[in-house]
Structures are given as structure tokens and as C-alpha cells.
Amino acid sequence: MSSDSRPPQPDTSTQSNSESESPAISSPTPQDHAPMTNRDWWPNQIDVSMLHPHPSQASPLGADFDYPKEFAKLDVDALKADVMSVMTTSQDWWPADYGHYGGLFIRMSWHAAGTYRIQDGRGGGGQGMQRFAPLNSWPDNVSLDKARRLLWPVKQKYGSEISWADLIIFAGNCALDSMGFKTFGFGFGREDVWQPEEVMWGEEDVWLGTDKRYSGKRDLAQPYGATTMGLIYVNPEGPEGKPDPVAAAHDIRETFARMAMNDEETAALIVGGHSFGKTHGAGDADLVGPEPEAAPIEQQGFGWKSSFGSGKGKDAITSGLEVVWTPTPTQWGNGFLELLYGYEWELTKSPAGAWQFTAKDGAGAGTIPDPFGGPGRAPTMLVTDISMREDPIYRRITQRWLEHPEELTEAFAKAWYKLLHRDMGPVSRYLGPWVAEPQLWQDPVPDVDHELVDAKDVAALKSKVLASGLTVAQLVKTAWSAASSFRRTDKRGGANGGRLRLEPQKSWESNEPADLDQVLSVLEGIQQDFNSSAAGGKKISLADLIVLAGSAAVEKAAKDGGHEVSVPFSPGRTDASQENTDVESFAVLEPRADGFRNYVRVGEKAPLEHLLIERAYRLGVTAPEMTVLVGGLRALGANHGGSEHGVFTDKPGVLSNDFFVNLLDMGTEWKASDAAENVYEGCDRSSGQLKWTATANDLVFGSNSVLRALAEVYAQSDAKQKFAEDFAAAWAKVMNNDRFDLE
């Protein structure tokens, strides 16, 4: 799952290369732990702490640190020159294969970026997570600790002007440049975090396990992007170590698709990445020591210390595979495909006992250079490399590239750029001089090409919206539908672009298409009237108007409740076209559930309260913000389908703290409904009369001790104004989540 069939790096070891990491290497062993934590005692409780993944107190740079501002001081050409120098300066403590660390750096970058998965946007290289557990100790990342240590002098020199997250990814891009490949571009802008996040990489309790993520014939559970716990993609020896290239192709196709790669991009990454470096399996993998997180303190974070020979250089063991893909492992060319199709292949084992293929009947013996000047070698390939020839779709693609290598060059350049940047969001977030033109997968939005509305225009537009006949609930739900598609994980979605009016979002069940169409029709009329009559070239986009209309409704609802609030509004959103919207790519943003609207897709089995926390996490809201948003949206009547679940008020449409007051009323007794699934009934404790209905999305604010503590604050008699102000602030945060231009 690591280098798998497609990493551009060959192996793991140390050198230039890189490949997967290795099923041959002993995996981390769970250690007995003590004492028991709350999570151990009550594993089914929701984890509210996940809403505060990176507290500012954890950063040594301080809450006011501005990475783009620091990066602006950086001499990027000097940085690149220094990285290039590191690549060709072999160190005795970890000698470079062929005198070049390029393959190793490619693998490092690939394995950082390649953890990205489309279903929830988690993973990727955007935060420098490879520095921390568990990624720094994954079996697939053997010896990448060496790659990062090689870069430490560069990081030390440039300090906070370059993040580790950027440097780790940039090094792989430099490696390609240094070996004669023309890259498509590069964008900086990844800001470091200072502690790991808890990410569900799988339910298995052993590394390299696969038993908990598959069902049926071989159906990989969502949201996982890898076939095996602790690997990036697939097992390079084949599924569960069975050396079957055709079966491996199935796993490759599935896992790369979950990283947003199609068949051609997948093949390009495997062929292109494996045109450099080598894998490492010089000897008995049992002689390799523990991973960094389990290594003795005196090793200072260095893991996988090997007692096989010198433990490095010609004796290196990383993946346990010993493969050199081409006769020119430090130079770009079409050698991978020329060898793949130029020989017949037979199944063999590496010196470490891992399955791989060797050119049949001794063909090509001595034609592959040894990394340290030893006798020439025979051509070798991974099981997953042979998949590029045996799978009919991959074969058709790679045979075309064999005849037209210039097409491979272009395909690899673009696929590599996508791999490194897929989790960074819109191109407006990219920094530096080498940013390529916007790509469809970046969800492009047009630049503002008109004068923006001013305060007077905003006031007039609010009045028109509120006089349009649309209700507070309709306006709030529409704005929420647009903005809440945002994911903090990969910076996708949000209101900017106005894609709520486009496929696929306008047809999502969660967005109530029929009602949405009615609201958008009215708002489009207001937009057209304004744009056709405004002076000075001023216009308002539908994206801006949707947000403005929702905010106007919030202000009205607060005023109706006796509270004056002002929701901040910053114009500048633009409207994307259907042509610049990849319907298939956007489909993964469709919510399975949205507890803020009390929506759940039919058939969803996960506990609603857990899905609510997950939704809040992706929106980037804190526990207090989640609490005030749910309570406010219930009061505003913004439930999906007009449901009354959780609407604990006799004046829906008015912004009040009634949700919390009535939820915490001990005069109400709750029980599961006999009439409806996932519904609870709140009855008067004395008379037994039904008062309210609710879902777990509502009741969790009374049952979970952390959330109840927050709910109590908003239920207090002195909290009415605070509640309205906090709701307005949290609302504005969600509306502006994708406004990176305001940061």
C-alpha cells in the first residue's frame, strides 16, 4: 500500500528511491498501556476533543504567526538550489543509491501526499503530518525518517520561511527536476501543525491487517483509501501478499480512484514514479529494528535500525523488495515501459523473501546497474508493476505510451502535480512563482470582474430579500446548504462559486431540490434586477446574494426575538460555470447526514451523534460553535423537510435560546419512539403528554457531559443576548469558510 504499484519512488530505504514499504518488515506491535483513559472506559462516547485538533497553544510560533507573510521573505531559487545540493551529497550515515537521493525524496513526498482520500478529504501532505505518529512509523514509511533528516539542514537554514509540510512535498518535486524531468509546476502554502490528528485509518488492531475493511467479494469500506492498515495504497506483493498482478490491478484501481485518480493518472504515477531509484530488500527483514515511535531514546527518532551487514547502503532493507526498474535510475526516460514490455517475467523472491518478478531465463542479466558499483543486475519488477501489463485497461494505456513517450511525460507531469496539491483547495491558496494554471480538479471560480456592492447596496438588497415572500427558514436553509458543503480537510466546497445552483448540488436530497429551486428563482430575480440597474458597474453574484440573504434572515430572526445583531458580510464571491464543475468529483461532498439540519440519508447506520461531530469537524467549528449553531438552526426552523424534531420552541423562525431551555427542562422525560426509527419523544413527566420530538442530534446536547456543560451556558437566563451574538459569529464563520482571500 505504500509505494505500491504506483509510487514514484522506489522503495523505502534510504536512498534515492523508493517503493513501498514493506510487508516484509516487522510491523509495529501494540504495547500494553496504562492507565485507562475515558476513551478506554467509554469507547462509544462521542469525541468532542476532535473539534479542537490544533490548539494555538500547541504552536511554538504563536497564535499570530502568519505563514504566507513569512514565506514572502523566502528566496525560493536559493531554497531549490540547496535541496538539489542535498540530493547529490551522499552521507555516510545513510549513503545515497547511485549517489543521488532523488528516489528517496520522491517516495517521501509521494507518501506524504498520497494519504489523501476523497471521501472525507483527510490525509495528504498539507500539514506535515508525516513527522508524527502514526504516519512516521507506518510499515509503508520505512526509512523516510532518513529523508527528513537529510533535509533538516535546509529547514534549519530557512527557518519559519518554509514549513516542513511544504519542504517535504517540494523535495520530491525538486528530485524530478534534478533527474531530467520537467515538472508541471509547484505551489507552496502548506502550514505546519504541531501535533498529530486522530484519523481513522482502519478498524484493524494490527498493522498490515486487512480483515476489517472488506466485505462481499472485495468491497473496500468507506472512507478508507488503502487496502491494508499501515500502507499508503496497496501491497506491492499483491493482495494479502499473493503475487497475482491481475488481482493487484483491481486493488490499484480502487485505491487510486479513492485518491481522485483515474486509470490514466494512476498508470502515469506508477510508470513515472518507478522510472527512478530502487526498492530495498538486501537481506533478512527480521534483522530490522523497531519503528521511530518505538525506538530507544538514544536513537533520537531514528527507526528501523538494521543489523544486517552495515544496515545501510548495499545492505539496506526497507520494503524487503529488491527491485531496480530501469537501466537509468537517476535519469528520466521510457526505460520502465521498455523493460516491462521488452522481457517476459517470472516470479521470484527478493533476498528478504518478498515476491517480485525477474526477467525470464536470465534475460538482460548484468544490464541493470548496481547502486554502489557492484556487478550489474538482472531486470526486476514488482507484482504491481506487472499489473500495468496484465490488466487490459492499463495495458492499453501503457502500450500507447511505449510508442509515444511524450504522452507519458505530459500525463505524469500533470498527475504528479495533482498528487502533490489535491488536498490544498483552490489555487488562490497556492504561494510562489511556479503555480500552474488552474485545473478542473481545483474547482476553479472566476475572478471578480466588476465593482463590488457597498454598504448602501447591501442594505437595499437585504430589504428586497426580506420583502420577497421567502421565509426565514427558506433563506437560512439555502445559505446553509451552500456554505456547509465546505470541508476543512481538503478545503473543498463552500458558498463561493455559487455551485448550489449547479449539478450535482442542486439535486442533492439534503438540499431539498424542489424548495431550493423556488428560493433560487426568487434570488436570481433580485440579482438580475440589481445588476441591470446598479450604477458604476456594480454587480452582485448569486453566490454572494445567497449568503447575504441568509444573513439578513438571521438578523431579522434575532430582532424578532428582541436582540440586535449584525452578521458580517464581505462581497467578492463569484459564480462558477457548470463547465468548470466536475460533477463526479463534487459527488463525494454530498452529506450522508447533516445534524445541523437534522438530516440523515435513508439507510444510514452510523450513530447520528457521531455523524454530527464529524460534520462539525469538517466545517472547522469548535464545540461551542457547534452547540450554538444547532440550537439556533432549530429555533429558526431550518430542519430538513420542515421536520419538527428538535424544534423546542413555540415561535419557530425567531432566534432564541429556547432549544437549550427546553432540552434541559427536567419536567420532560425522553424515550425512544415506537413509531419512528431514530426518533425520541419528550413527554411531560407528570401528565405523560407529548411535548417534543427529537433525534440523537438534539439529545446529545443533554446526554454528553461536555456538550451539556456548553448547553447549560446558553440556557441560562442571562444568556439570551450572548446566544444571539455567538450564533451570528458562528454563522458568519461557516459562511466565510472558503473565503481564503479574507485571511
Swiss-Prot record:
Q: Which UniProt keywords apply?
A: Heme, Hydrogen peroxide, Iron, Metal-binding, Oxidoreductase, Peroxidase
Q: What molecular functions are annotated in GO for this chain?
A: catalase activity; heme binding; metal ion binding
The UniProt record gives the binding positions of heme b as 274
Tryptophyl-tyrosyl-methioninium (Trp-Tyr) (with M-259) cross-link site: 110-233
Q: Where is the composition biased (Low complexity)?
A: 16-28
Q: What does this protein do?
A: Bifunctional enzyme with both catalase and broad-spectrum peroxidase activity.
Q: State the organism named in the record.
A: Mycobacterium ulcerans (strain Agy99)
Oligomeric state and interaction partners are given as: Homodimer or homotetramer.
List site positions: Transition state stabilizer.
107
Q: Which GO cellular component terms are attached?
A: cytosol
Q: How is it modified after translation?
A: Formation of the three residue Trp-Tyr-Met cross-link is important for the catalase, but not the peroxidase activity of the enzyme.
The biased composition feature labelled Polar residues covers: 1-15
The cross-references to PROSITE patterns, in alphabetical order and at most eight, read: PEROXIDASE_1 (PS00435), PEROXIDASE_2 (PS00436), PEROXIDASE_4 (PS50873)
**Known EC number:** 1.11.1.21
Residues in the active site?
111 (proton acceptor)
Sequence similarity: Belongs to the peroxidase family. Peroxidase/catalase subfamily.
Under Gene3D superfamilies, the record lists: 1.10.520.10, Peroxidase, domain 2
Would you tell me the protein name for this molecule? Catalase-peroxidase
HAMAP family in UniProt: Catal_peroxid
Placement of covalent cross-link Tryptophyl-tyrosyl-methioninium (Tyr-Met) (with W-110): 233-259
Q: What class of enzyme is it?
A: oxidoreductase
* UniProt-listed GO biological process terms: cellular response to hydrogen peroxide; hydrogen peroxide catabolic process
Q: Which InterPro entries match?
A: Catalase_peroxidase, Haem_peroxidase, Haem_peroxidase_sf, Peroxidases_AS, Peroxidases_heam-ligand_BS
Query: What are the boundaries of the region Disordered?
Result: 1-40, 490-511
- CDD domains for the chain: catalase_peroxidase_2 (cd08200)
Which coenzymes or cofactors are required?
heme b
